[in-house]
Every structure is written in C-alpha cells, then in structure tokens.
Amino acid sequence: MKKLLNTVYVTTEGTGLRKDGENLVAELDGVQKGRVPLHMVGSVVVFGGTYVSPGLMGACAAHGITIVLLDRVGRFQARVEGPVAGNVLLRRAQYKASEAPEDIVKSLILGKVSNQRAVLLRALRDHGADFPAAEALAVKDAIDRMAHILRKVGASAEDADHLRGAEGEAASLYFGVFGQLIRSPDGDFAFRGRSRRPPLDPTNALLSFLYTLLTHDCRSACESVGLDPAVGFLHRDRPGRPSLALDLMEELRPVLVDRLALSLINRRQLRATDFQRLDGGAVLLTDEARKTVLSAWQERKKQERRHPFLEESAPLGLVPYLQAQMLARHLRGDLDAYPPWFWK
C-alpha cells in the first residue's frame, strides 16, 4: 500500500525554505528551524510571506512533491508541481462520465450523508445523557430525517440536480444541530450555521481552515492517480475550482474534519483567545493556534481505520488517495460502481 508521507506546514512569516543536499531546510533570521529528508515529504504547504528557493522548487518537482502557497488567512494562491501524472484514456473516461454523473453523484452523497449521520449518532451515544431534552430530541429528529434521505437517494432514479437537492437538505439538517455537539462552556464557540468567505465566528474559522487542508490532500490524491481535479461530478465545473477534489472531500470531511474540530473545541485545546477578528467581521486563527491545529491534523491523519471496501486498515491520511484510486478503477471499468467510504 502507498506510504503516508509527511506534509510540511510553514506558518511563520519570513521563513525561508531551501534545498541542502537531499534535505528541505527551513530557516528564520539566519537560524535553522527544521530539516527534513525530501524522500519523507509528500507536500509542502506555506502560509503568507515565505521564501522558497528555486533550487528547492526544482527538487520538489523532480521528487513529485507539490508546493502549495496560501495567503496568511489560508486562501489558496498557487501550486508549484512537476509534470502531471495524467493518463489520457482515464481522463477521457472521466470527462465522459461527467456528462451523465448520476451514479457517481449518488455514491458520493450516500457516503457523505451516512458519515454526517454517523457523527451525530456517535455524539448522541457518547454525550446524549448530558444533552438538554430539547437538544437531544432535535439531534434524534435530524438523524431520523437523514436516514429517510439516505433511503430516498439509494432508491432514486432522478437526475443529478435532484440528487444535489437531497444532499443540500441533509447538510441543512446536519449543520442545523451541529452546534449542539459543541460542549465547551465558552459562548464564543456557539454555532448558528455555516458561514464562509469569510467565516464569521471561531467554529466556522476552524472548519474552513481544516477544509482547506483536506481539499489540498484530495486534490493531490486525484492528481496522483491520473484524474483531472478540475472536473467533478457532484460539484459542477467552475473556472479555477478543483471540483473533483471537492467531490472526494464531501464524504470524508464529517469524520476527518468535523470530529477533529469538535474535539479541539470540546477538550478546550482552543480558546476564544486563539482567534482574531478582522475589520469587516472575518474571524481567523492566530498563528499559534494554527500550529496547534496543524499538529492535531497531522496526528489525526496517522490514525488507522479499516477500509470498508478494501477490508484492510489504513491511515486516515491515505483515505483520499484510496478513494481516488477506487474512482479511477470505476472509470476504467474495473469496478461496477464507485464504493463510498463509510465510517463505522
């Protein structure tokens, strides 16, 4: 099985990255802060004003290491990568399937909604006794209604737009009770629904930051198996949007991101002071809080779970690659359907 390599995250403004032999070296104010062998690196993600030497860029391209440039708040700016490992026959099959995407869309939605529902079920099982009666009832109602949506989608022969509508309904139910899964006494983490571009409260800021990291991993997974990350099935084409990466992210984010965010908040590893509010209302993680989240994200990706289709254990960080591989096998005709990743 593919080995889970390290992602190097650089969050400190003014850091310089260079190549020394077969190593990536990070320096700040002339002092070496880190050294990692290139053969242990899968990708490099840098935030804000970081200098990356041309020599390191060339070495990363030669080793198949992608460099992702984000601005200081985590918005995507650019990617630096070597030749894309594309297979023209696979991509033709992908483009053809995108014209009639219903079967793949159905599988993606079944995976996403099942995993969202599993997150609610786990929260009710672990903490239901602490929920006020009205909150517990609301979560149970969402669980029941999501089960109905799963049955409806599973039996549906409708077009992709109708399937997307069911996915949107499930998302509304899920995020409608997500705030009740937050057990921190800190009122600043109160969650009243998703807000994006920009996030307007600490919980949304944390979710958006983690979703950015997962999107990067899913995009890299698509490219590593030869798929075009820009052409999706659940997400429609839009210039500049990695639609297929977003497709793969949907079924994974309830488990990889949402549960991690809840853990960081409920265990009080993050406090209200770990966030800053900008003019205009946007809320962002502080630099130190970002390091806390990145460390937890790396540890989360090392945790192993049994893959329901492959029937073997794999680190969570490899699941995007495994799902991209399953999709490629389906598009080639080796699998009758795309098998979603279900969390149990």
Curated annotation (Swiss-Prot):
Superkingdom, taxonomy of origin: Bacteria
Cofactor(s), names only, from the UniProt record: Mg(2+); Mn(2+)
Alphabetical keyword list: Antiviral defense, DNA-binding, Endonuclease, Hydrolase, Magnesium, Manganese, Metal-binding, Nuclease
GO biological process: defense response to virus; maintenance of CRISPR repeat elements
The keyword Mitochondrion is assigned to this record: no
Cross-referenced InterPro entries: Cas1 (IPR050646), CRISPR-assoc_Cas1 (IPR002729), CRISPR-assoc_Cas1_C (IPR042206), CRISPR-assoc_Cas1_DVULG (IPR019856), CRISPR-assoc_Cas1_N (IPR042211)
A GO term, aspect molecular function: DNA endonuclease activity
Gene3D superfamilies cross-referenced by the UniProt entry: CRISPR-associated endonuclease Cas1, C-terminal domain, CRISPR-associated endonuclease Cas1, N-terminal domain
Presence of keyword DNA-binding: yes
Chain sites annotated for binding Mn(2+): 167, 235, 250
Enzyme class, first EC level, given as a word: hydrolase
EC number: 3.1.-.-
Family stated for the protein in its record: Belongs to the CRISPR-associated endonuclease Cas1 family.
Function: CRISPR (clustered regularly interspaced short palindromic repeat), is an adaptive immune system that provides protection against mobile genetic elements (viruses, transposable elements and conjugative plasmids). CRISPR clusters contain spacers, sequences complementary to antecedent mobile elements, and target invading nucleic acids. CRISPR clusters are transcribed and processed into CRISPR RNA (crRNA). Acts as a dsDNA endonuclease. Involved in the integration of spacer DNA into the CRISPR cassette.
NCBIfam families named among the record's database cross-references: cas1 (TIGR00287), cas1_DVULG (TIGR03640)
Subunit structure: Homodimer, forms a heterotetramer with a Cas2 homodimer.
The protein's name in its UniProt record: CRISPR-associated endonuclease Cas1 2
Organism: Rhodospirillum rubrum (strain ATCC 11170 / ATH 1.1.1 / DSM 467 / LMG 4362 / NCIMB 8255 / S1)
